[in-house]
Amino acid sequence: MEQLLSHSLLENKLALRQLFGQSVDFYTKDIQICGLACCICMFEGLSSIERLWVMLLDTASREPLDVTGPEQLYEYLLKGSAVPLEPRPVTCLSEAQTYLTAGTTLLLIDGVDRGLVMSTQSMQFRSVSEPTGEGNLRGSREGFTELLRINFSLIRRLVRSDSLRIETFTAGQRTATEIGLCYDARLCPPRLLRRLRARLSDLPLPVVLDSGYLTPFLGRGGFSFFSGIGSTERPDRAAAKICEGKAVILVNGSPFALVVPWLFYENFQSMDDYSAKAYFASFIRLLKYAAFFIAVLLPGAFVCAVGYTPELLPPELLYKVAAAEKATPLPLFLETLVVNFLLEIVREAGLRLPKQVGHSVSLVAALIIGDAAIQAGL
């Protein structure tokens, strides 16, 4: 059962202190408004004390406050005041916790069993910058940030349509992370929207810190080598997918948006395809397909050719392979597996290590691979 706020200001302050466990960043200040005892509560770093004081003092100096009791003061601040802080009522501690951790300020008045939250958010966030994982030659240089509302504005600025819809959900019993669902009401299939709403409303996760946490719960289920959910950190690409009838899911704290559904061929698309001529974009896409199938099939095809149909190989290459087989104790199949395994290790090291060390590892690996290719006659 939810704990309701009390008429006693002291009891409400003690309940909030107990709720947040005497956290040092939880700020409370006793003030007097029209001779009535009040208290403001906020989290340092999430709310702006300066903005709150400027707005309240400016309004108090401009407006005559003619109130005689706590209920009158509460109703005046809620409905009659010109304070531009979007005041909203709060009746229980769980609501107060949700609003406070979102960066708002809670105003408590002695003698009133309700609180008043005001929009004083002042969170520090990374500015909009160029995405590092999705480069392009032409087009926008903007990337998503970690703040959900900023990401909403980036999409809304690109898709200025009356059919663009943005819905929010809350996931994670411990983190209470806000999730945004963006779609075009005229283009997105209703069946897809019903499925996404049902799954986002009932996520069995105690913690949600990134959009990747949602991926296993949004797919159709069953085994598949390729995911049916894509990701992007570019607002223009997310806007393009929305205009194609897909849904985009954003998570507060993550610069990566999820795109549902995601088809296999979309892994080979880029934003440059939209700004290039059709035949040139198709040619580049065919090159990507060819590179993918070569990387996947060539090692196995080479092992099969050497082991079962060596007459398909050029004699010079066959002689070098035979000489290399004599010098190594492992069969060609195991050699190929070891090489692929080492390549994955080098790739992970280049990605996860600090940039200074990762670049050095990648350079050394490239030199070793190049030297091995020359010695093999390739």
Locate predicted features.
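Transmembrane alpha-helical segments that form the functional core of multipass membrane systems
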Residues: 249, 256, 262-378
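Membrane-embedded alpha-helical signal segments
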Residues: 1-297, 311-315
